[in-house]
Amino acid sequence: MILFPAIDLKNGQCVRLEQGDMDRATVFNLDPAAQAASFAAQGFEYLHVVDLDGAFAGKPMNAQAVEAMLKVVKMPVQLGGGIRDLATIEAWLGKGVTRVIIGTAAVRDPALVKEAAKQFPGRVAVGLDARDGKVAVQGWAETSTVTALEIAQRFEDAGVAAIIFTDIARDGLLKGLNLDATIALAEAISIPVIASGGFASIDDVKALLEPRAKKLEGAIVGRALYDGRLDPAEALALIGRAAAA
């Protein structure tokens, strides 16, 4: 079970949004690289980074901040936001990103995901962000007519490394993960699934360690860390004990 601390980038700063609304952004750190180093020092083993401006623009917009993070941390980094073509994927993987996350393009251009997964095995994840059961795209500004399961099933045999499933209604609101929907998705496909949206406290860690969540690869945690509602040492120790049991 992997806990992915999240760094969301807006105007080169580390922010958290509420329900994906760019007008409801709280700046938590002016220096994303320092934030990444802090997460590494706390013992996290995999970093989750999103270029929020890039998600809206359809191309990388916070490249300088991402590159600064890649220089200071040795842990794997998965990156999403504005990754819509093979050239961008190849560029980021070449710069040291471990895994790219394709969101909007996974809905609009599934062939891109399949080709990328073929060219870069194990290094392409799909981000599915759902609002009322339907997948949202373009930085969550638009909602499609397809469900997360319908899209995930398109990639069943494509070699996608993971599906990151976000419940937009909970994102940034500290209401707890939507494990029912996430587990239902994980049980319907063979691709590993990562839970995202609403992580609130140590109770979410405990829920992730229950037998029913065994198919999940992990979860992304954002505001709960920044607000001090989740003690990293306590969370990682709990996961470590469960892994050793």
Swiss-Prot record:
**In Gene Ontology terms, what is one molecular function of this protein?**
1-(5-phosphoribosyl)-5-[(5-phosphoribosylamino)methylideneamino]imidazole-4-carboxamide isomerase activity
Can you tell me which residues form the catalytic site?
Answer: 8, 129
Record-level GO BP terms: L-histidine biosynthetic process; L-tryptophan biosynthetic process
Which SUPFAM superfamilies has this protein been placed in? Answer: Ribulose-phoshate binding barrel
Is the Amino-acid biosynthesis keyword given for this protein?
yes
Question: What Gene3D superfamilies does the record point to?
Answer: Aldolase class I
Q: What are the entry keywords?
A: Amino-acid biosynthesis, Cytoplasm, Histidine biosynthesis, Isomerase
Localization, per the record, is:
Cytoplasm
In short, the EC number is 5.3.1.16
Please state which protein family the record places this protein in: Belongs to the HisA/HisF family.
- Amino-acid biosynthesis keyword on record: yes
Catalysed reaction equations from the record: 1-(5-phospho-beta-D-ribosyl)-5-[(5-phospho-beta-D-ribosylamino)methylideneamino]imidazole-4-carboxamide = 5-[(5-phospho-1-deoxy-D-ribulos-1-ylimino)methylamino]-1-(5-phospho-beta-D-ribosyl)imidazole-4-carboxamide
Q: What is this protein called?
A: 1-(5-phosphoribosyl)-5-[(5-phosphoribosylamino)methylideneamino] imidazole-4-carboxamide isomerase
Q: Which pathway does it operate in?
A: Amino-acid biosynthesis; L-histidine biosynthesis; L-histidine from 5-phospho-alpha-D-ribose 1-diphosphate: step 4/9
Q: What class of enzyme is it?
A: isomerase
User: Which domain of life does the protein's organism represent?
Assistant: Bacteria
Primary location group:
cytoplasm
* GO CC field: cytoplasm
Q: Please tell me the species this chain comes from.
A: Rhodopseudomonas palustris (strain BisA53)
